[in-house]
Amino acid sequence: MQKRKVRNAWLFISSLIVGLFSFPFAFAKSVEKRATQFKNSVSNLHVSDFVPTIPSAVSVYDSLRLNLAGLNRRAFELAQQGYEKLREQGTLLNDNIISIIDFSLPSTEKRLYVVDLKNYQVLYKTYVAHGRNSGSVMANSFSNNPSSNKSSLGFYNTLGTYIGKHGYSLKLEGLEKGINDNAYNRAIVMHGAEYVNPNYISKLGYIGRSLGCPAVASREATPIINTIKDGSCLFIYSPNTAYQEHSSILRYLAEDKV
């Protein structure tokens, strides 16, 4: 009987000693397992999980409800695609702003949109004139030729300002060869004009027209010009398929996707 008690005591002590020695190893193994799991979870993360991305054309268009503001979805999508290309090329110095003139709309409607892409705001929605030989109510004929008195479609880079015969004005650089690259030599600029006035609509059925310049209302010229000057993207859109087929910028975008 005494021997059995001694043996049981010995077995208890032996088990206790083995347990004490094995516990650190079991604990270490558990820690190692958790560390491995954490390492694997971290390795599955990507830089894109932490770096904010530029919002897509769809998200900006829908978030700002630009459809309710009257802006053609296709106009905005093409504008932002071209904007991204120009931004990548380092063309744009003022890359928070994009301006879109939507010539799918008549001149009786507000069709110049200035959008702050950084802060998700429509800064301006207002009237803008087209060239007198581009049409009366609708702009449907376009040219890059001097003395055509027509508007030119496509992407522009805004330059500096000056005081001219129309007052405070903004120089524009056409970025598409054969489409609008004569803009600077044609003196195609943004300026204020008294004929960009809804009062003209009741008299003529459309607002006044320019010699090809995207003219805005005189009272709005200075704040708009100061917002978009010095290297922002201006896109003049029309559902004109000839432009979209020959646009160098849109063609580059299509080639990039191939």
Task: Please annotate each region the language model reported.
Residues V31-L211, R219-S232, T241-V258:
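Cell wall/extracellular polymer interaction/catalysis modules
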